[in-house]
Amino acid sequence: MMPSSFGAIDQPVSRIKEESLMSAPAVPDRFTTLPDEHALQATVVALEEHGFSVEVVDDLDAARQAVLARIPEGSSVMTNTSVTLAETGIADAIDHGGDRWESARNKMFALDFATQGQEMKAIAGQPDYALGSVHAVTRDGTLVIASASGSQLASYAWGAANVIFVVGAQKLVPGLAAAHERIYQHSLPLEDVRAQAAYGQHSQVGKVLEIHQELPGRIHIVLIRQSVGF
């Protein structure tokens, strides 16, 4: 698929993240500060009240183990472009870990976007499991995800049978205003640097998805007690 940044369906981030972040702009500490235990637990309760299931883990290894344990063998799995999925090793485990799961990403990129673009979109948009992260989680239980192209948003909102979000606890914010501040003042500047290193182009906020409510059982959140991702 044509390159498009900010969590869109494109190339893996692990190869260029270290190089790109060497020139990343400074961002306010409030966007990377971990919440206290009271705020974390209050957010978990709010998320559960809105139909999301949540588990809290201590580190990146535990997050990877938690995610992989939830995915039945043979499932089609789309690893949407995510610094968090790269840092936890989840993307590599799915896309380069053998034949335990069907990598929707690998299947998609075996096709030609110029002649098979719609088929590629169908593969990415309707997997058994869509994996990714979010840019903010509000205290009252809303998930906020920004994207340049919106290519991953369809699977999150409707297309995927199951969705698993892996989220660093630093992304917890008081409300929607703070969520949008975090996107524009923190996530976008960092993603812009990454996009220039990966694709030679700037990023942008083209679309923003807010998930306020979900039918129980479809969206699972693995919340990490560490700062990870943008």
What kind of region is each of these model predictions?
Residues 1-19:
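N-terminal amphipathic/basic-hydrophobic helices that include classical n-h-c signal peptides
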Residues 6, 23-32, 51-57, 79-84, ...:
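Phosphate-binding glycine-rich loops and adjacent basic patches that engage nucleotide phosphates
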Residues 15-25, 74, 104-113, 167:
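Short N-terminal helix-initiation segments at or just after the protein's N-terminus
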Residues 25, 71, 159:
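Catalytic cofactor-binding cores of redox enzymes
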Residues 30-31, 53, 106-109, 163-170:
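Flexible, glycine/proline-enriched loop segments at strand-loop-helix junctions
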Residues 36-121, 126-131:
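N-terminal active-site beta-alpha-beta segment that forms phosphate/nucleotide-binding
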Residues 124-230:
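Conserved phosphate- and dinucleotide-binding cores of soluble alpha/beta proteins
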